[in-house]
UniProtKB/Swiss-Prot annotation:
Keyword field: Capsid protein, Cytoplasmic inwards viral transport, Disulfide bond, DNA-binding, Host endosome, Host Golgi apparatus, Host nucleus, Host-virus interaction, Late protein, Microtubular inwards viral transport, Phosphoprotein, Viral penetration into host nucleus, Virion, Virus entry into host cell
GO biological process terms held by the UniProt record: microtubule-dependent intracellular transport of viral material towards nucleus; symbiont entry into host cell; viral penetration into host nucleus
UniProt function note: Minor protein of the capsid that localizes along the inner surface of the virion, within the central cavities beneath the L1 pentamers. Plays a role in capsid stabilization through interaction with the major capsid protein L1. Once the virion enters the host cell, L2 escorts the genomic DNA into the nucleus by promoting escape from the endosomal compartments and traffic through the host Golgi network.
Modifications the protein undergoes after translation, according to the UniProt entry: Highly phosphorylated.
GO molecular function: DNA binding; structural molecule activity
Motif (Nuclear localization signal): 1-12, 444-452
GO terms for cellular component: host cell; host cell endosome; host cell Golgi apparatus; host cell nucleus; viral capsid
Subcellular localization: Virion; Host nucleus; Host early endosome; Host Golgi apparatus
Gene: L2
Protein family according to the UniProt entry: Belongs to the papillomaviridae L2 protein family.
Pfam families on file: Late_protein_L2
Lineage summary: Viruses, Monodnaviria, Shotokuvirae, Cossaviricota, Papovaviricetes
Main location: virion
Protein name: Minor capsid protein L2
Subunit structure: Interacts with major capsid protein L1. Interacts with E2; this interaction inhibits E2 transcriptional activity but not the DNA replication function E2. Interacts with host GADD45GIP1. Interacts with host HSPA8; this interaction is required for L2 nuclear translocation. Interacts with host importins KPNB2 and KPNB3. Forms a complex with importin alpha2-beta1 heterodimers via interaction with the importin alpha2 adapter. Interacts with host DYNLT1; this interaction is essential for virus intracellular transport during entry.
Amino acid sequence: MVSHRAARRKRASATDLYRTCKQSGTCPPDVINKVEGTTLADKILQWSSLGIFLGGLGIGTGSGSGGRTGYVPLGGRSNTVVDVGPTRPPVVIEPVGPTDPSIVTLVEDSSVVASGAPVPTFTGTSGFEITSSGTTTPAVLDITPTVDSVSISSTSFTNPAFSDPSIIEVPQTGEVSGNIFVGTPTSGSHGYEEIPLQTFASSGSGTEPISSTPLPTVRRVRGPRLYSRANQQVRVSTSQFLTHPSSLVTFDNPAYEPLDTTLSFEPTSNVPDSDFMDIIRLHRPALSSRRGTVRFSRLGQRATMFTRSGKQIGGRVHFYHDISPIAATEEIELQPLISATNDSDLFDVYADFPPPASTTPSTIHKSFTYPKYSLTMPSTAASSYSNVTVPLTSAWDVPIYTGPDIILPSHTPMWPSTSPTNASTTTYIGIHGTQYYLWPWYYYFPKKRKRIPYFFADGFVAA
């Protein structure tokens, strides 16, 4: 059986032994010599250093360090030397005896002035003299002027370089005239030139142009390119994108958020809306019309990757929200309110209505033929004197004659006759008194298949 010998306990280092045993005086002599550097080898080096210089070579009795720079192996790299700063001095602990007070005063004792000190007395002639007077003695002040009088003199110099401008005199009585420039006399000499004023406004015939159209010198500003291939198109359905867009990126919802500026955010992995993941910037909003809708758009910037230098790389996203559709224009088919071929009710006016047995109305047909159209106007007349057909006005400038069945009590009227207008005469508007209407030749467009009436509802426009 092999006996196991107890392991040898390692002795403490010389430095540790020196710290504990130096104060008590129980240190071995080899420990003291090694720590304090008083060994035989140290003494030989001290003696030899008197004649030769051995500094910086690292020659000593301690462990080999290879000098100040250390050992450098062949083909290798030197180790980095770390400078160790100075250690703090130890705190000296002062023992407190049993008779010392346990309360330490922080404020020094102040000097106390003893009460009851005598009042200092002032002697000599340099002090103030206090003179007491009785209540019956009046106070008299000597106000006699001195012999020497004070004289005040003033001197003024005139410098033309710093002279004040001419003073405007009080304006005279105003005048009543068409001239708005009333001169006011000024004192002094005038240093300016009087130029007679010219009138720019001139009288004309009234046909001169009074307005002009400026040239479009300002170039049109191009809008943001939101629908390019480099932008990802994302549609936002919630209405918070219009009022609080930051609530879709972060959970912080400020009370006052600017709506027309660029918003910046910190990159985060927890966002309320997944479409706004990695969004670090939302640019200013823009309103546009797209396919019949009003669209609210914002251009966003993502921060998908980060480089070592701290640069953020990511794509651009176009977030848009359709506010409301633009309704198409409602088309209403227009219909003529009156017929151009039957206007019998527009010409007959009955003054009074006689009994049915006393009158027998007869119908007279009057035909007026013009190129490309014909018109027949029936009129109703009576053989009695009380019923007379009077044509007020006509929608065409054509001659109108009375029939033989109309008999007036006094004499036979002679209606003014007008010669038929030549069809080749170019006439667009016919004027009768204070009213005008379009010429019937241009009521219809002959070259178009669809016939559209080219007149108003009643056929007349009051001037």
